[in-house]
Amino acid sequence: MSIMEYNGGSCVAMAGKNCVAIASDLRLGVQSISLTNNFPKVFAMGDKTYLGLTGLATDVQTLYELFRYKVNLYKFREERQIQPKTFANLVSSTLYEKRFGPYFSFPVVAGVSNDNTPFICGFDSIGCIDFAEDFIVSGTATEQLYGMCESVYEPNLEPDDLFETISQALLNAQDRDCISGWGCVVYVITADKCIKRLVKGRQD
């Protein structure tokens, strides 16, 4: 068993037309034992910048607190919100600092820049950035998510269509992964707002 699969969980981000969406499942478990169905893995790092964390649950919480601290310091120093690409570089350097004893997490960053350009990227556990223009997947349902996203994704989707696409991709992928599931949370980020929706899924 890989330590990355100890708690389970999956995350996906998609880029649309001047918008992005990021979603994660809500399950927290220890292998096949489910503990809760209210453990979201997506966190706000700014008005239009979001972070998804999959992997070992303790490292998910540790990294969230660490990035929250660093982003707050950035706001105090710069007196502005952090941009998605800047935050991605912050994530990369933070993970690389621990390259000899890495965090057991594969983060995903999604956001909309000041010029309304959608931005998504993923990372490995030591901070190598994987930039993408369509979608990024992470977690134990990675293979299933790749198949679903390649089937249903289309470029330049409007926010409502992007929500439907990412929801269907994640719900169908997590149904085929026994340590992800129990519904999902979806954030759709546009230039002027962020919409959060909870999507019900199978509870078995």
UniProtKB/Swiss-Prot annotation:
* Chief location: cytoplasm
Q: Which UniProt keywords apply?
A: Cytoplasm, Nucleus, Proteasome
Disulfide cross-links: none
**Any GO BP annotation:** proteasome-mediated ubiquitin-dependent protein catabolic process
- Gene3D superfamilies of this UniProt entry? Glutamine Phosphoribosylpyrophosphate, subunit 1, domain 1 (3.60.20.10)
Question: A single Pfam family, by name?
Answer: Proteasome
Q: Which CDD domains match?
A: proteasome_beta_type_3
Top-level taxon of origin: Eukaryota
Cell compartments where the protein resides: Cytoplasm; Nucleus
Q: Which family does it belong to?
A: Belongs to the peptidase T1B family.
Matches recorded under PANTHER family = METALLOPROTEASE TLDD, PROTEASOME SUBUNIT BETA TYPE-3
Role according to the record: Non-catalytic component of the proteasome, a multicatalytic proteinase complex which is characterized by its ability to cleave peptides with Arg, Phe, Tyr, Leu, and Glu adjacent to the leaving group at neutral or slightly basic pH. The proteasome has an ATP-dependent proteolytic activity.
Note the subunit structure: The 26S proteasome consists of a 20S proteasome core and two 19S regulatory subunits. The 20S proteasome core is composed of 28 subunits that are arranged in four stacked rings, resulting in a barrel-shaped structure. The two end rings are each formed by seven alpha subunits, and the two central rings are each formed by seven beta subunits. The catalytic chamber with the active sites is on the inside of the barrel.
What is the protein name given in its UniProt record? Answer: Probable proteasome subunit beta type-3
Organism, as annotated: Schizosaccharomyces pombe (strain 972 / ATCC 24843)
Its taxonomic placement starts with: Eukaryota, Fungi, Dikarya, Ascomycota, Taphrinomycotina
Q: Which gene encodes it?
A: pup3
